[in-house]
């Protein structure tokens, strides 16, 4: 708990269940604090280690913070925009509101009504910005490049997880469900692995309630193909960077995605990426002389098979894309860069 009188930015989280938005807050706020930003969170479902304020502390929003004309309220959902509008416009509190939009779909009339009343809007990708009818600043997500980094020894990284160090591995990480394209990944591996005995595949992630049958069907499909010992379903892990470090190629097979951090996490670990053209993937993965991977059409199994094979069968290309991905994430996608860009938006409102 921190004294709201020492807080200039409030980051609300009004959703109890863990989501991508909540995860963004959890990862960003400590970095923002480390960079000197006077930010605190508000709401449930967040680690107690984060600096926070209480709802009853909001009474202090009538007073300006020292040296500033107002505070900033950084909303990421409709349910967080509405109370801020009421505090600012109805109660006349000293507040400016920022909204970050990650949605790649047409906004409802209600969402548009709220967004038009923001003092500043951030879009998490160029595609997201295209769905906004108001001026906005594009700030791509970043990742913790200290947490996601290559192994000192890939052989040892594989051994530590009980994997065969003599094999190369293709991975697909995230929730196991149709929307995430897990079935496309599995089917592509069923097509590719039989004639590539030196490769294996890893599916890391959890299937929840309605998706358990989907996962079971995929495992049955793998077993029928005689690949149960080569396409591994390892479940959900908290040490996911260790699993990236054991990979040689990563596939992001999503049919739909809001942003999608997994390609960045893979590239930061020195792993080339094959990704579908959804979310922000086409803005993260690059081709040409600085190739970090390949972008393919969504829901296209043949394209996925061909793209994965292009790396699996070309070791020099695989190695070059690995080095390029590492350089690209380090230069352009460190989470500190995201935090500084967001701070510039805050500053523009608190001058």
Swiss-Prot record:
It is an enzyme of class 2 (transferase). The keyword Transferase applies. GO terms for biological process: lipopolysaccharide core region biosynthetic process. Gene3D superfamilies: Glycogen Phosphorylase B. It holds the Pfam family Glyco_trans_1_4. Keywords: Glycosyltransferase, Lipopolysaccharide biosynthesis, Transferase. The keyword rRNA-binding does not apply. Coiled coil: none annotated. One of its GO terms (molecular function) is glycosyltransferase activity. It comes from the Bacteria. Pathway: Bacterial outer membrane biogenesis; LPS core biosynthesis. Its EC number is 2.4.-.-. Acts at transfer of mannose group to a 3-deoxy-D-mono octulonic acid (KDO) via an alpha-1,5 linkage. Belongs to the glycosyltransferase group 1 family. Glycosyltransferase 4 subfamily. This is Lipopolysaccharide core biosynthesis mannosyltransferase LpsB. It comes from Rhizobium meliloti (strain 1021) (Ensifer meliloti). The gene is lpsB.
